[in-house]
Amino acid sequence: NKSAKTIKEELSYINEQALFADGFDEALVGIDQSDYVAVYDTDKCIDILMQKIGMNQEDATEYFDFNILGSYMGEYTPRFIKIYE
């Protein structure tokens, strides 16, 4: 797996206007090649909120849905995906 640093460097080279979700580097999983934006794992984002901020799962999910998933910062807003293994 590529590190968040490598993904950020690669994406910034391809699309210098790409935006990243602050504090969620551990959840950065790739690049959407159709729009060249950052792609994050939703479950990992929620885990980060639970671990680093101390929220329970319900609060972390609600916070993520409203404040992160629901925010639109323009054309290069990151994408969030649910990964099923």
Predicted regions: what they are:
Residues 1-85:
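C-terminal alpha-helical interaction appendages
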